[in-house]
UniProtKB/Swiss-Prot annotation:
The keyword Lyase does not apply. This is ATP synthase subunit beta 1. Produces ATP from ADP in the presence of a proton gradient across the membrane. The catalytic sites are hosted primarily by the beta subunits. Belongs to the ATPase alpha/beta chains family. Its EC number is 7.1.2.2. It is found in: Cell membrane.
Protein backbone atom coordinates (compact mmCIF):
# COMPACT_ATOMS: atom_id res chain seq x y z
CA UNK A 1 0.00 0.00 0.00
CA UNK A 2 1.36 3.42 -0.96
CA UNK A 3 2.40 5.60 1.96
CA UNK A 4 0.84 9.03 2.33
CA UNK A 5 3.90 11.25 2.73
CA UNK A 6 4.53 14.95 3.14
CA UNK A 7 7.51 17.29 3.32
CA UNK A 8 8.54 19.63 6.12
CA UNK A 9 8.65 23.18 4.73
CA UNK A 10 9.29 25.10 7.98
CA UNK A 11 10.38 24.42 11.56
CA UNK A 12 9.70 26.85 14.41
CA UNK A 13 10.70 25.35 17.74
CA UNK A 14 8.51 22.27 18.09
CA UNK A 15 5.99 23.42 15.46
CA UNK A 16 6.39 21.77 12.07
CA UNK A 17 4.70 23.05 8.91
CA UNK A 18 4.25 20.19 6.46
CA UNK A 19 3.12 20.12 2.83
CA UNK A 20 0.97 17.24 1.51
CA UNK A 21 -0.91 16.57 -1.69
CA UNK A 22 -4.15 18.53 -1.58
CA UNK A 23 -6.30 15.38 -1.59
CA UNK A 24 -4.29 13.59 1.10
CA UNK A 25 -4.28 15.98 4.05
CA UNK A 26 -4.13 14.10 7.38
CA UNK A 27 -6.95 14.71 9.84
CA UNK A 28 -6.52 16.79 13.01
CA UNK A 29 -5.03 14.57 15.72
CA UNK A 30 -3.42 12.09 13.31
CA UNK A 31 0.16 11.00 13.96
CA UNK A 32 2.99 11.76 11.53
CA UNK A 33 6.25 9.83 11.64
CA UNK A 34 9.62 11.49 10.99
CA UNK A 35 13.28 10.53 11.38
CA UNK A 36 16.30 12.39 12.77
CA UNK A 37 19.83 11.25 13.54
CA UNK A 38 18.58 10.53 17.10
CA UNK A 39 15.81 8.16 16.08
CA UNK A 40 12.22 7.91 14.88
CA UNK A 41 9.61 10.24 16.39
CA UNK A 42 6.00 11.27 15.95
CA UNK A 43 4.27 14.60 15.46
CA UNK A 44 0.57 15.36 15.92
CA UNK A 45 -1.48 17.38 13.44
CA UNK A 46 -3.03 20.35 15.26
CA UNK A 47 -4.09 22.70 12.45
CA UNK A 48 -4.83 22.84 8.73
CA UNK A 49 -3.04 26.03 7.69
CA UNK A 50 -3.71 25.97 3.95
CA UNK A 51 -5.12 24.00 1.05
CA UNK A 52 -2.26 21.51 1.20
CA UNK A 53 -0.36 22.36 4.41
CA UNK A 54 -0.77 21.36 8.03
CA UNK A 55 0.79 22.47 11.29
CA UNK A 56 1.98 19.72 13.65
CA UNK A 57 3.48 19.60 17.15
CA UNK A 58 6.53 17.37 17.52
CA UNK A 59 5.97 14.64 20.12
CA UNK A 60 9.69 14.08 20.45
CA UNK A 61 13.05 15.61 19.54
CA UNK A 62 13.56 18.06 16.68
CA UNK A 63 17.34 18.34 16.98
CA UNK A 64 18.84 17.54 13.57
CA UNK A 65 15.53 18.01 11.76
CA UNK A 66 15.71 20.00 8.51
CA UNK A 67 13.40 21.41 5.86
CA UNK A 68 12.75 18.88 3.16
CA UNK A 69 12.57 15.96 5.60
CA UNK A 70 9.90 13.44 4.62
CA UNK A 71 7.11 12.62 7.08
CA UNK A 72 4.67 9.72 6.87
CA UNK A 73 0.97 10.08 7.70
CA UNK A 74 0.15 7.00 9.82
CA UNK A 75 -3.59 7.48 9.20
CA UNK A 76 -4.55 7.35 12.88
CA UNK A 77 -3.76 9.07 16.20
CA UNK A 78 -0.85 7.90 18.36
CA UNK A 79 -1.53 4.29 19.40
CA UNK A 80 0.01 2.56 22.41
CA UNK A 81 0.19 -1.11 23.47
CA UNK A 82 -2.25 -2.05 26.26
CA UNK A 83 -3.10 -5.10 28.33
CA UNK A 84 -0.99 -7.67 30.13
CA UNK A 85 2.09 -7.08 27.97
CA UNK A 86 2.69 -3.63 29.50
CA UNK A 87 2.23 -4.63 33.15
CA UNK A 88 5.45 -4.52 35.13
CA UNK A 89 7.03 -2.26 32.49
CA UNK A 90 8.30 1.33 32.27
CA UNK A 91 7.23 3.05 29.04
CA UNK A 92 7.45 6.39 27.25
CA UNK A 93 4.69 8.39 25.56
CA UNK A 94 4.68 6.01 22.54
CA UNK A 95 4.36 2.94 24.77
CA UNK A 96 7.98 1.99 24.00
CA UNK A 97 10.12 0.36 26.71
CA UNK A 98 12.56 2.57 28.64
CA UNK A 99 13.42 -0.02 31.30
CA UNK A 100 16.17 -1.75 29.33
CA UNK A 101 13.98 -4.78 28.60
CA UNK A 102 12.63 -5.98 25.21
CA UNK A 103 9.77 -4.01 23.68
CA UNK A 104 6.32 -5.14 24.94
CA UNK A 105 4.47 -7.27 22.41
CA UNK A 106 1.94 -5.00 20.72
CA UNK A 107 -0.87 -7.58 20.62
CA UNK A 108 -3.48 -4.89 21.20
CA UNK A 109 -3.03 -1.16 20.54
CA UNK A 110 -5.43 1.63 21.46
CA UNK A 111 -5.38 5.27 20.27
CA UNK A 112 -4.68 7.78 23.05
CA UNK A 113 -7.73 9.86 22.07
CA UNK A 114 -10.94 8.23 23.26
CA UNK A 115 -14.47 9.29 24.12
CA UNK A 116 -15.55 9.54 27.73
CA UNK A 117 -17.91 6.80 29.00
CA UNK A 118 -21.60 7.34 28.30
CA UNK A 119 -23.75 8.49 31.20
CA UNK A 120 -25.73 5.25 31.25
CA UNK A 121 -22.48 3.27 31.62
CA UNK A 122 -21.29 5.09 34.74
CA UNK A 123 -21.35 3.38 38.12
CA UNK A 124 -22.60 5.62 40.93
CA UNK A 125 -21.98 3.16 43.77
CA UNK A 126 -19.11 4.43 45.91
CA UNK A 127 -17.14 3.04 48.82
CA UNK A 128 -14.27 4.36 50.92
CA UNK A 129 -10.71 3.34 50.06
CA UNK A 130 -8.81 3.46 53.35
CA UNK A 131 -5.15 4.40 52.94
CA UNK A 132 -3.75 3.93 56.46
CA UNK A 133 -2.70 7.61 56.43
CA UNK A 134 -4.41 9.26 59.40
CA UNK A 135 -5.08 12.78 58.19
CA UNK A 136 -6.47 11.54 54.85
CA UNK A 137 -8.69 8.80 56.28
CA UNK A 138 -10.05 11.15 58.98
CA UNK A 139 -10.56 14.47 57.17
CA UNK A 140 -10.59 13.78 53.42
CA UNK A 141 -11.30 10.08 52.78
CA UNK A 142 -10.71 8.77 49.27
CA UNK A 143 -13.57 7.27 47.27
CA UNK A 144 -12.96 4.08 45.33
CA UNK A 145 -13.58 5.09 41.74
CA UNK A 146 -13.20 8.77 42.62
CA UNK A 147 -10.66 11.48 41.87
CA UNK A 148 -8.33 12.89 44.53
CA UNK A 149 -5.99 15.87 44.15
CA UNK A 150 -2.85 16.57 46.20
CA UNK A 151 -2.27 20.33 46.04
CA UNK A 152 0.90 22.05 47.23
CA UNK A 153 3.87 24.23 46.34
CA UNK A 154 7.42 23.11 45.74
CA UNK A 155 9.04 21.02 48.47
CA UNK A 156 6.06 20.46 50.79
CA UNK A 157 5.89 16.69 50.26
CA UNK A 158 3.42 15.98 47.43
CA UNK A 159 5.54 13.34 45.71
CA UNK A 160 6.44 11.59 48.98
CA UNK A 161 2.76 11.48 49.98
CA UNK A 162 1.91 10.16 46.49
CA UNK A 163 4.55 7.41 46.85
CA UNK A 164 3.18 6.44 50.28
CA UNK A 165 -0.33 6.23 48.83
CA UNK A 166 1.00 4.03 46.01
CA UNK A 167 2.75 1.82 48.57
CA UNK A 168 -0.25 1.51 50.91
CA UNK A 169 -3.04 1.16 48.36
CA UNK A 170 -1.10 -1.16 46.03
CA UNK A 171 -0.68 -3.57 48.93
CA UNK A 172 -4.46 -4.04 48.84
CA UNK A 173 -4.10 -5.65 45.40
CA UNK A 174 -5.39 -4.70 41.97
CA UNK A 175 -3.72 -3.06 38.99
CA UNK A 176 -1.98 0.31 39.03
CA UNK A 177 -0.79 2.78 36.41
CA UNK A 178 1.67 5.52 37.41
CA UNK A 179 2.05 8.42 34.98
CA UNK A 180 4.95 10.83 35.50
CA UNK A 181 4.15 14.05 33.63
CA UNK A 182 7.06 16.47 33.38
CA UNK A 183 8.67 15.33 36.62
CA UNK A 184 12.27 14.46 37.53
CA UNK A 185 13.90 11.36 36.09
CA UNK A 186 15.17 10.24 39.52
CA UNK A 187 11.62 10.22 40.93
CA UNK A 188 10.45 7.84 38.21
CA UNK A 189 13.46 5.56 38.61
CA UNK A 190 13.14 5.64 42.42
CA UNK A 191 9.46 4.70 42.24
CA UNK A 192 10.19 1.89 39.78
CA UNK A 193 12.81 0.39 42.11
CA UNK A 194 10.48 0.71 45.14
CA UNK A 195 7.66 -1.04 43.29
CA UNK A 196 10.10 -3.76 42.29
CA UNK A 197 11.35 -4.20 45.87
CA UNK A 198 7.82 -4.30 47.35
CA UNK A 199 6.65 -6.96 44.88
CA UNK A 200 3.80 -4.94 43.32
CA UNK A 201 5.60 -4.08 40.05
CA UNK A 202 4.06 -7.04 38.11
CA UNK A 203 0.62 -5.40 38.54
CA UNK A 204 1.88 -1.88 37.77
CA UNK A 205 2.67 0.05 34.59
CA UNK A 206 4.93 3.12 34.83
CA UNK A 207 4.63 5.71 32.03
CA UNK A 208 7.10 8.60 32.02
CA UNK A 209 7.38 11.87 30.11
CA UNK A 210 10.20 13.71 31.85
CA UNK A 211 10.67 17.44 32.36
CA UNK A 212 13.55 17.60 29.85
CA UNK A 213 11.34 16.34 27.03
CA UNK A 214 9.37 18.37 24.50
CA UNK A 215 6.04 19.99 25.47
CA UNK A 216 4.28 17.61 23.07
CA UNK A 217 5.56 14.62 25.05
CA UNK A 218 4.56 16.15 28.39
CA UNK A 219 1.12 17.05 27.04
CA UNK A 220 0.36 13.57 25.66
CA UNK A 221 2.03 11.21 28.15
CA UNK A 222 -0.90 11.67 30.57
CA UNK A 223 -3.23 10.34 27.85
CA UNK A 224 -0.95 7.33 27.31
CA UNK A 225 -1.22 6.35 30.98
CA UNK A 226 -4.97 6.98 31.01
CA UNK A 227 -5.49 4.83 27.88
CA UNK A 228 -3.67 1.90 29.51
CA UNK A 229 -5.91 2.28 32.59
CA UNK A 230 -9.06 2.49 30.43
CA UNK A 231 -8.23 -0.80 28.72
CA UNK A 232 -7.90 -2.55 32.09
CA UNK A 233 -11.27 -1.11 33.12
CA UNK A 234 -13.22 -1.69 29.90
CA UNK A 235 -11.76 -4.88 28.43
CA UNK A 236 -10.37 -6.74 31.44
CA UNK A 237 -13.10 -5.40 33.76
CA UNK A 238 -10.69 -4.59 36.58
CA UNK A 239 -10.50 -1.93 39.27
CA UNK A 240 -7.53 0.29 38.47
CA UNK A 241 -5.48 2.82 40.44
CA UNK A 242 -4.25 5.72 38.29
CA UNK A 243 -1.54 7.93 39.80
CA UNK A 244 -0.60 11.15 37.99
CA UNK A 245 2.36 13.32 38.98
CA UNK A 246 1.93 16.17 38.01
CA UNK A 247 -1.28 17.58 36.51
CA UNK A 248 0.19 21.10 36.54
CA UNK A 249 2.96 19.96 34.15
CA UNK A 250 0.26 18.59 31.82
CA UNK A 251 -1.46 21.99 31.86
CA UNK A 252 1.88 23.81 31.52
CA UNK A 253 2.78 21.72 28.46
CA UNK A 254 -0.58 22.62 26.92
CA UNK A 255 0.21 26.28 27.57
CA UNK A 256 3.58 25.93 25.83
CA UNK A 257 1.99 24.26 22.82
CA UNK A 258 -0.70 26.96 22.68
CA UNK A 259 1.98 29.68 22.71
CA UNK A 260 3.95 27.89 19.99
CA UNK A 261 0.79 27.99 17.86
CA UNK A 262 0.53 31.74 18.41
CA UNK A 263 -2.73 31.65 20.37
CA UNK A 264 -3.55 34.51 22.76
CA UNK A 265 -3.19 33.44 26.43
CA UNK A 266 -5.57 34.19 29.31
CA UNK A 267 -4.83 35.22 32.91
CA UNK A 268 -1.53 33.86 34.18
CA UNK A 269 -0.31 33.02 30.68
CA UNK A 270 -2.45 29.88 30.41
CA UNK A 271 -4.03 28.68 27.18
CA UNK A 272 -7.53 29.91 26.37
CA UNK A 273 -8.67 26.27 26.08
CA UNK A 274 -7.54 25.43 29.64
CA UNK A 275 -10.95 24.37 30.98
CA UNK A 276 -11.72 22.21 27.94
CA UNK A 277 -8.35 20.43 27.96
CA UNK A 278 -8.62 19.63 31.67
CA UNK A 279 -12.29 18.65 31.29
CA UNK A 280 -11.64 16.31 28.34
CA UNK A 281 -8.90 14.58 30.31
CA UNK A 282 -10.72 14.37 33.65
CA UNK A 283 -14.03 13.19 32.18
CA UNK A 284 -12.34 10.05 30.84
CA UNK A 285 -11.28 9.13 34.39
CA UNK A 286 -14.52 7.50 35.45
CA UNK A 287 -15.96 4.33 36.94
CA UNK A 288 -18.29 2.21 34.83
CA UNK A 289 -20.26 -0.95 35.41
CA UNK A 290 -17.24 -2.86 34.03
CA UNK A 291 -14.71 -1.55 36.54
CA UNK A 292 -13.39 1.52 38.30
CA UNK A 293 -10.52 3.96 37.88
CA UNK A 294 -9.46 5.51 41.19
CA UNK A 295 -7.29 8.49 40.38
CA UNK A 296 -4.82 10.27 42.67
CA UNK A 297 -3.29 13.37 41.11
CA UNK A 298 -0.55 15.74 42.26
CA UNK A 299 -1.17 19.39 41.39
CA UNK A 300 1.71 21.84 41.82
CA UNK A 301 0.71 25.31 43.07
CA UNK A 302 2.90 28.07 41.57
CA UNK A 303 4.01 30.41 44.38
CA UNK A 304 1.75 28.40 46.76
CA UNK A 305 -1.28 30.11 45.17
CA UNK A 306 -4.37 27.95 45.66
CA UNK A 307 -6.30 30.35 43.37
CA UNK A 308 -3.98 29.78 40.40
CA UNK A 309 -6.04 29.11 37.22
CA UNK A 310 -4.47 25.64 36.84
CA UNK A 311 -5.67 24.64 40.32
CA UNK A 312 -9.10 26.22 39.87
CA UNK A 313 -9.60 24.35 36.57
CA UNK A 314 -8.84 21.06 38.35
CA UNK A 315 -10.85 21.57 41.58
CA UNK A 316 -14.31 21.09 40.11
CA UNK A 317 -13.48 17.61 38.79
CA UNK A 318 -12.28 16.17 42.11
CA UNK A 319 -14.09 14.20 44.81
CA UNK A 320 -11.37 14.78 47.43
CA UNK A 321 -8.95 17.69 47.75
CA UNK A 322 -5.86 17.35 49.95
CA UNK A 323 -3.98 20.64 50.45
CA UNK A 324 -0.39 20.59 51.70
CA UNK A 325 0.83 23.78 53.34
CA UNK A 326 4.33 25.18 53.75
CA UNK A 327 3.66 26.59 57.24
CA UNK A 328 2.81 23.09 58.52
CA UNK A 329 5.90 21.60 56.85
CA UNK A 330 7.95 24.35 58.54
CA UNK A 331 6.79 22.98 61.93
CA UNK A 332 8.29 19.60 60.99
CA UNK A 333 4.86 17.95 60.75
CA UNK A 334 4.57 15.51 57.85
CA UNK A 335 2.45 14.89 55.87
CA UNK A 336 1.99 18.68 55.87
CA UNK A 337 -1.75 18.47 55.15
CA UNK A 338 -3.94 21.39 56.18
CA UNK A 339 -7.12 19.76 57.58
CA UNK A 340 -9.05 23.03 57.34
CA UNK A 341 -8.44 23.55 53.62
CA UNK A 342 -8.78 19.89 52.67
CA UNK A 343 -12.18 18.36 52.04
CA UNK A 344 -13.88 15.30 50.59
CA UNK A 345 -17.30 14.57 49.18
CA UNK A 346 -17.07 11.27 51.05
CA UNK A 347 -16.97 12.94 54.47
CA UNK A 348 -20.65 12.53 55.26
CA UNK A 349 -22.51 10.01 57.43
CA UNK A 350 -23.73 8.05 54.38
CA UNK A 351 -20.20 7.01 53.46
CA UNK A 352 -18.18 7.06 56.69
CA UNK A 353 -20.83 6.63 59.38
CA UNK A 354 -22.10 9.02 62.06
CA UNK A 355 -19.25 8.43 64.53
CA UNK A 356 -16.50 9.20 62.00
CA UNK A 357 -18.36 12.24 60.67
CA UNK A 358 -18.90 13.76 64.12
CA UNK A 359 -15.27 13.19 65.16
CA UNK A 360 -13.99 14.83 61.96
CA UNK A 361 -16.34 17.79 62.52
CA UNK A 362 -15.09 18.21 66.09
CA UNK A 363 -11.46 18.06 64.96
CA UNK A 364 -12.10 20.75 62.35
CA UNK A 365 -13.91 22.94 64.90
CA UNK A 366 -11.08 22.68 67.43
CA UNK A 367 -8.38 23.39 64.83
CA UNK A 368 -10.36 26.36 63.48
CA UNK A 369 -10.81 27.78 66.98
CA UNK A 370 -7.10 27.25 67.64
CA UNK A 371 -6.26 29.28 64.51
CA UNK A 372 -8.46 32.11 65.81
CA UNK A 373 -6.82 32.02 69.25
CA UNK A 374 -3.33 31.91 67.71
CA UNK A 375 -3.42 35.67 67.05
CA UNK A 376 -4.17 36.37 70.72
CA UNK A 377 -1.42 33.97 71.81
CA UNK A 378 1.11 35.64 69.50
CA UNK A 379 0.39 39.08 70.98
CA UNK A 380 -0.54 38.48 74.62
CA UNK A 381 0.55 34.91 75.34
CA UNK A 382 -1.31 31.90 76.74
CA UNK A 383 -1.83 33.59 80.12
CA UNK A 384 -4.56 35.83 78.71
CA UNK A 385 -6.71 32.89 77.63
CA UNK A 386 -9.52 31.43 79.71
CA UNK A 387 -9.04 27.98 81.25
CA UNK A 388 -11.40 26.50 78.66
CA UNK A 389 -9.51 28.07 75.77
CA UNK A 390 -6.14 26.94 77.17
CA UNK A 391 -7.46 23.39 77.35
CA UNK A 392 -8.72 23.66 73.75
CA UNK A 393 -5.32 24.96 72.55
CA UNK A 394 -3.45 22.04 74.14
CA UNK A 395 -5.87 19.51 72.65
CA UNK A 396 -5.65 21.18 69.23
CA UNK A 397 -1.85 20.96 69.31
CA UNK A 398 -2.04 17.30 70.32
CA UNK A 399 -4.38 16.61 67.38
CA UNK A 400 -2.11 18.58 65.02
CA UNK A 401 0.90 16.55 66.15
CA UNK A 402 -1.05 13.28 66.14
CA UNK A 403 -1.93 13.76 62.46
CA UNK A 404 1.78 13.49 61.62
CA UNK A 405 2.89 10.01 60.61
CA UNK A 406 6.07 8.07 59.76
CA UNK A 407 5.97 6.77 56.17
CA UNK A 408 7.16 3.46 54.80
CA UNK A 409 8.73 5.15 51.77
CA UNK A 410 10.85 7.46 53.96
CA UNK A 411 12.09 4.80 56.41
CA UNK A 412 15.59 4.83 54.93
CA UNK A 413 15.85 8.61 55.41
CA UNK A 414 14.26 8.99 58.85
CA UNK A 415 15.24 5.71 60.47
CA UNK A 416 11.66 5.47 61.79
CA UNK A 417 9.50 2.51 60.80
CA UNK A 418 6.42 3.42 58.76
CA UNK A 419 2.91 2.78 60.08
CA UNK A 420 -0.43 1.83 58.54
CA UNK A 421 -3.17 2.97 60.93
CA UNK A 422 -6.46 1.09 60.88
CA UNK A 423 -9.57 3.27 60.88
CA UNK A 424 -10.82 1.96 64.25
CA UNK A 425 -7.49 2.76 65.92
CA UNK A 426 -7.55 6.22 64.34
CA UNK A 427 -11.07 7.05 65.53
CA UNK A 428 -10.34 5.62 68.99
CA UNK A 429 -7.25 7.81 69.31
CA UNK A 430 -9.12 10.97 68.27
CA UNK A 431 -11.94 10.19 70.73
CA UNK A 432 -9.47 9.84 73.60
CA UNK A 433 -7.76 13.16 72.78
CA UNK A 434 -11.10 15.00 72.45
CA UNK A 435 -12.40 13.48 75.70
CA UNK A 436 -9.37 14.75 77.60
CA UNK A 437 -7.88 11.32 78.39
CA UNK A 438 -4.42 12.67 77.51
CA UNK A 439 -4.66 16.21 78.89
CA UNK A 440 -1.69 15.49 81.18
CA UNK A 441 0.50 14.19 78.35
CA UNK A 442 3.05 16.35 76.53
CA UNK A 443 2.19 17.50 73.02
CA UNK A 444 5.50 16.04 71.81
CA UNK A 445 4.35 12.53 72.77
CA UNK A 446 1.92 12.62 69.83
CA UNK A 447 4.45 13.38 67.10
CA UNK A 448 5.02 10.60 64.54
CA UNK A 449 3.17 7.81 66.29
CA UNK A 450 0.62 5.41 64.83
CA UNK A 451 -2.28 5.38 67.30
CA UNK A 452 -2.95 5.65 71.03
CA UNK A 453 -1.52 2.14 71.34
CA UNK A 454 1.95 3.56 70.66
CA UNK A 455 1.83 5.97 73.62
CA UNK A 456 4.23 4.76 76.31
Amino acid sequence: MKKNTGTIISISGFVLKIEFNESELPEIGFALEYHTHQGTYLAEVVQHTGINTVSAIAIGEVSGLARGTEVVNLGHPIEVPVGETVQGRMLNVYGKAIDGKPEPAAEVKWPIFRDQPLLRELDTNKEILYTGIKVIDLICPILKGGKTGLFGGAGVGKSVLMQELINNISMLGGNSVFTGVGERVREGIGLYKELEASGVLPQTTVVLGQMNESPGVRMRVALTGLTIAEYLRDEEKKDVLLFIDNVFRFIQAGSEVSSLQGKIPITGGYQSTLSKEVGDFQDRIASTKNGSITSIQCVFLPADDIDDPSAVATFSHLDSTIVLERSIAALGIFPAVNPLQSFSRALNPTFVGERHYQLAAQVKFILQRYMELQEIINVLGMAELSDEDRKLVHRARKIRNFLSQPFYVSEKFTGTEGTFVEIEDLLGSIERILNGDYDERSERDFLFIGSYKDLK
